[in-house]
Amino acid sequence: MENFLLALNVVLPIFFIMTLGFLLKKIKMADEHSLNIMNKLVFRVFMSTLLFLNVYNIGDLSALSMDNLKLLGYAFIIILVVLFIAWLIYMPKVKDKRKLSVLIQGVYRGNFVLFGLAIVDSIYGKEGLATVSLLTIVVIPTFNVLAVIILEYYSGREISKLKLLKQVIKNPLIIATLLGIIFIILKINIPKPIYKTLSDISKIATPLAFIVLGAELEFGNMVKNIKYLISANILRLIGNPLITVGVGKLVGFQGIELVALLSMSACPTAVASYTMAKEMNADGDLAGEIVATTSMLSIFTIFCWVLMLKNLEWI
């Protein structure tokens, strides 16, 4: 019963906030224009500030233990493994390259910052957030760099290495991560008033992002892509965490480390994947539908994963 309640405590706040967003859209307190603006604010300002502070709060990279480095190395490798498996599955069957890139991205690229922080905070509190913040140093740049490469490669346009580099460098989450690392390496201390301001701004990120995500959920036009959506949801919400957490346990990770890996792999497809797909000539409609369906279904699957791992005493 205790494990059941813990799992509920993880997913219910996410569900309630997303439901609020959905209702606000229905009663016309938010429209497409305002949601687009809020989405940009979340992505470029609030989420980036949150990510910067989480990295900055690590404090000292020289204090990283071998276990920390092992976790970072594993996260990087397993992302590549999941991406390769998704490519092997979809490459022979999906002839439309614009859909192929979106499906691959939908499987490996999760909404790690948003859902990951919420999941780990619910289970382990600040102690767990330190581990997730550490993972962001590797996970966020890897997610985004690979997304730019895949979407550009399958866009049907001539590939420019300079354009690829620009797409990577301009990503707000990558910039925030790198800034956090630079502040740590140079031992730059942020004055208390500025830190307090940044901290207050960062607290807006998670609830507002969930409100926007809930408001943007649309299920009316998904029939034409139903077979792609079913496979993407199974691979994203079941296959990815099964591989990532299962192999992670075999490698020797446990407790907070496994929860961090679960939050990386079991969360829904990143909201930014929709924006990036539209900007890079991929199938934006399919990308948005994958984000919407995985976001809704993940409420149930994350609950099941947390409950199962708790009962197995892995976390």
Segments from the language model and where they lie:
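Alpha-helical transmembrane segments of multi-pass small-molecule/ion transporters
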Residues: M1-I315
